[in-house]
């Protein structure tokens, strides 16, 4: 359980219209092997054994969560996040929750980020980011949360500009014909870089739209009953 019954409060908001397809930003927020893109993530997470000892938990309708892990901020010269943790979070903990179709909740111990994506056109996506703390925060605690938020996120943070560059480059290569397909073939026993959550997303996307994710422009009857192919769902 995370956050409990505490009231939340948004303290940061910014948005951007990105030159990419909506699904690519959803993919970026969902798959964890893209963490190799971020220097901060490589040093503080991927390089450590504990990062790889977590599992994805997959739920019906493609709502997913990655088990909480510990981030080693000292590996990047950043301070510990051991005080003022949000309810349900351990010191230096991190957890990511994905709500179908396009909402991500990312908690880094003391602060939460909420992403929402809105498709505007095939190559235009509105992305909105919110930094969230507790409504009960004292001024000192709120200042701490803002600092921790801006160390990694925010328009001038370390990660978001890299995410935007990645998804816009992906879209450009697709439009120009350099990359016709996206492959979601990793099977790692539901470990962090398993593609099971992405496969679940596209199975649910296909069910909702009545289209086969691997051939969306096919005419005629399309089998959108994916219950026979989802073998990785967590029973709840």
Predicted regions and their residues:
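C-terminal catalytic domain of Rieske-type non-heme iron oxygenases
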Residues: 1-236
